[in-house]
């Protein structure tokens, strides 16, 4: 079932105007907005990327800890470097001793210092396995140092219009000055999908094996909803369980037409809850 939610107050006038135009052409005349669902999350947002319409949300502009959702920006800059010829997916990178700084309780793809690895494998380790070690090595490959890479992250965030975001590292480790919002993460993900459609396909990959260690994609919706073709999970103790998900949904009563929905769920109590609440919002 496709449901359109009533947007929150700051954007209700603009959303109403856009919604009217969409309803005339895409939905039955009798269709009416329904109240937004109660979502068990600190913040959430649902956007129709196709039209740019905000369909609903709560606390969309509240500063939150993005955790591994940070890696959406890390991937964005890697995709940009590949597009611009600064990196190639078949290029081999040799991890330095800095990968030893990644702690054993952090998500890893299990890189080894001095053992060459391709940019493609690093990208899969970053996206599918959410490897903090992959984030660090890619940051150094693009920026020279992680410090320089973080400068690029913040510059890109400003360029994209992420008005309430500031990064301090490439992996999403907790820091008082490392923050974003549901709205900004929606802007980032929509831009990634639009600007790098081929690279975005990494996000639909259900598992990846590196160093003889197979790890599944942590986005459970890839198995539960056939219209979901990507997204990114995030979790720290302080951030809670977070999930950005995109689904390409057919438009009802419009043969051959579809729209892309993008949900952002921040700060739930468990992996199961973030999955459940994402499904609730998308449906």
Segment roles from a protein language model:
Residues 162-166, 174-283:
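Domain-terminus/edge residues, biased toward the C-terminal soluble/receptor-binding domains
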Residues 1-9:
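N-terminal secretory signal peptides that target proteins for export/translocation
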Residues 31-183, 191-194:
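Active-site-adjacent loops and short helices of periplasmic peptidoglycan-processing enzymes
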Residues 13-26:
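Bacterial N-terminal signal peptides
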Residues 8, 12, 29-40, 256-258:
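Extreme N-terminus of proteins, especially the signal/transit-peptide cleavage junction
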């Amino acid at each position: 079932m496709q449901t359109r939610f009533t947007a929150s107050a700051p954007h209700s006038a603009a959303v109403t105007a856009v919604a009217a135009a969409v309803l005339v052409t895409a939905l039955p005349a009798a269709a009416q907005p329904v109240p937004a669902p109660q979502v068990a999350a600190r913040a959430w947002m649902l956007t129709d990327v196709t039209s740019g319409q905000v369909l609903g949300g709560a606390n969309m502009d509240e500063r939150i800890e993005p955790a591994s959702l940070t890696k959406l920006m890390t991937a964005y800059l890697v995709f940009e470097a590949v597009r611009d010829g600064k990196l190639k997916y078949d290029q081999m990178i040799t991890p330095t001793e800095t990968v030893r700084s990644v702690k054993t309780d952090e998500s890893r793809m299990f890189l080894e210092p001095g053992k060459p690895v391709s940019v493609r494998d690093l990208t899969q380790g970053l996206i599918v396995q959410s490897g903090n070690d992959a984030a660090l090595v890619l940051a150094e490959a693009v920026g020279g140092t992680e410090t320089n890479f973080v400068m690029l992250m913040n510059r890109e965030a400003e360029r994209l219009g992420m008005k309430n975001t500031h990064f301090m590292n490439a992996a999403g480790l907790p820091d008082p000055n490392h923050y974003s919002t549901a709205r900004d993460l929606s802007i980032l993900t929509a831009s990634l999908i639009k600007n790098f459609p081929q690279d975005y396909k990494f996000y639909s990959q259900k598992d990846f094996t590196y160093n003889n260690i197979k790890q599944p994609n942590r986005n459970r919706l890839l198995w539960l909803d056939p219209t979901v073709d990507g997204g990114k999970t995030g979790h720290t103790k302080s951030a809670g369980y977070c999930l950005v998900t995109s689904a390409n949904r057919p438009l009802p009563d419009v043969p051959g037409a579809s729209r892309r929905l993008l949900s952002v769920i921040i700060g739930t109590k468990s992996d199961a809850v973030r999955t459940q609440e994402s499904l609730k919002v998308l449906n």
